[in-house]
Amino acid sequence: MLSYGIPEFRLPKSLVAKELENITDLGVDLETNVVIGRSLTVDDLFARGFDAVFLGTGAGLPNFLRIPGENLLGVYSANEFLTRVNLMKGYKKGEVPTPVKVGKRVAVVGAGNVAMDAARTAKRLGAEEVYIVYRRGAEEVPARKEEVEHAKEEGVIFKLLNNP
């Protein structure tokens, strides 16, 4: 999740790699990119001799709104969008070719930290207008205040008290 779901501008991939190296240097065994319950179970890990198991579950499944059009091409959950950008190196726009296409106008429904990341990423990938669409008022936005301020500084437009 650290490498795929968080934008480069918030958490550089080189820092994640260094921190993982620091952890393994302490003698911690890491099993990354494993789907617990499919390729490996917790019981399998204990059978391998592990005394403790930490399950870093990452982000949960997205909540879709069940509205017409949400299954159209170009409609993603924020986590899927961020993962696509990270895996396809979209954060290196101009340096590497990437198949991540962002429209001229982008709407991000929701106002949490992940929504701010998605909006700021879309803006950085060239979207001319990026909107945060949120059903509640400014005082109820769940994102950290500094994340909201960064989004506004980068030109993200907030449409509050709106519900698609």
Where are these regions (language model features)?
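Residues forming the flavin
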Residues: 1-164
